[in-house]
């Protein structure tokens, strides 16, 4: 591989067009070489310096392509990852990594056999609000953490005609937002002892789950992840309570909105969260004190830079295969908990 890694992108829907293509194009050391899309004719008019294919075979057969990014509907993630690895490509899979632990294990084994890097796109590790929270927790500002609440709510009362909201395998909110919110909790607190989950379809006409509330059980700590589609007045993005005080963070990381608006990654204002978190403390007399916390800078390009370095053999993958397998198992066991209505222990 040259020092400029040539990347092929499979899928040019929301994930491919809004997230992956601009991030690849604005990460030093990466070049967008090829795109596979059913919209080939339209993309040929938009991209003059990128190869555009209607199917994956030419991309996988192209020796100039070093890595493949898979941004297709979820059910295609594992089969395409296996095909790309068999073709000798490094692979980055949009979340979720696969639909099951068995699929995920097959991909990991194939990557090991091919001596290729495989990782999963957990870009929200580089959200400004999460990086700020991580700093607060790691510095011990809140003392011993007792509760961590992570909300990612939306008000989308109308069911849309798209695969993410269909009853097709891999559809639904649990497989859409669950990987992000669970991964963040695993980054903060590690592997839990048990999970209790409630996953439901709440909107009229919903064909897949559009709500979840899951509790990760740790000794002396509960981490709660929650997402709904009928929430016009959202709770704080993060609310964390410990023996020395609380941390509250409203708003949401700006990078997705910036990408949707066409802001180039790295442009002035990129990743700058204008809503500061608050540390809240009360003294023995009950007097409440609040102070703002400076936000970290969010930058999804850090994920792609780490993936680039892993391909070049000078760094670790941004999400290890062990982490990818753990998260897949947690998603499965969470579904088991919701289906059975009981708390499920984790070894």
Predicted regions mapped to residue ranges:
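N-terminal Rossmann-like dinucleotide-binding module
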Residues: 1-47
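C-terminal helix-rich "cap/oligomerization" subdomain common to oxidoreductases
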Residues: 1-4, 67-69, 265-266, 292-294, ...
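Beta-loop-alpha module in the N-terminal Rossmann-like domain of NAD(P)-dependent dehydrogenases
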Residues: 50-110
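Rossmann-like NAD(P)(H) cofactor-binding subdomain of soluble oxidoreductases
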Residues: 76, 96, 119-126
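Rossmann-fold dehydrogenase core element
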Residues: 106-123, 144-148
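Predominantly a Rossmann-like dinucleotide-binding segment in NAD(P)-dependent oxidoreductases
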Residues: 124-205, 341
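Contiguous beta-strand/loop segments that form the cofactor/metal-binding neighborhood of enzyme cores
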Residues: 183-266, 294, 301-315
């Amino acid at each position: 591989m040259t020092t400029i890694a040539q990347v092929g992108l499979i899928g040019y829907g929301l994930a491919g067009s809004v997230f992956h293509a601009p991030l690849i194009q604005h990460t030093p050391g990466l070049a967008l070489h090829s795109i596979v899309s059913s919209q080939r004719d339209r993309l040929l008019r938009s991209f003059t310096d990128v190869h555009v294919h209607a199917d994956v075979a030419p991309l996988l057969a192209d020796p100039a392509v070093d890595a493949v990014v898979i941004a297709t509907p979820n059910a295609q993630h594992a089969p395409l990852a296996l095909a790309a690895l068999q073709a000798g490509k490094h692979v980055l899979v949009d979340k979720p990594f696969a639909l099951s632990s068995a699929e995920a294990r097959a991909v990991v084994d194939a990557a090991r056999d091919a001596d290729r890097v495989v990782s999963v796109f957990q870009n929200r590790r580089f959200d400004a609000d999460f990086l700020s929270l991580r700093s607060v927790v790691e510095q011990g500002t809140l003392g011993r953490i007792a509760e961590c609440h992570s909300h990612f709510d939306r008000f989308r009362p109308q069911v849309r005609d798209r695969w993410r909201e269909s009853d097709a395998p891999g559809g639904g909110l649990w497989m859409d937002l669950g990987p992000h919110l669970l991964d963040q909790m695993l980054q903060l607190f590690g592997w839990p002892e048990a999970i209790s989950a409630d996953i439901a379809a709440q909107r009229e006409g919903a064909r897949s789950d559009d709500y979840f509330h899951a509790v990760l059980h740790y000794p002396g700590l509960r981490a709660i992840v929650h997402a709904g589609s009928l929430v016009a007045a959202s709770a704080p993005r993060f609310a964390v309570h410990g023996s020395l005080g609380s941390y509250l963070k409203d708003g949401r990381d700006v990078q997705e909105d910036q990408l949707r608006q066409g802001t180039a990654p790295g442009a002035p204002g990129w990743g700058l969260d204008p809503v500061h978190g608050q540390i809240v403390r009360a003294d023995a007399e009950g007097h409440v004190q609040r102070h703002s916390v400076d936000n970290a800078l969010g930058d999804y390009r850090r994920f792609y830079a780490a993936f680039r370095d892993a391909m070049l053999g000078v760094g670790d993958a941004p999400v290890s295969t062990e982490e990818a397998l753990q998260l897949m198992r947690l998603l499965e066991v969470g579904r088991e908990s919701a289906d059975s209505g009981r708390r499920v222990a984790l070894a």
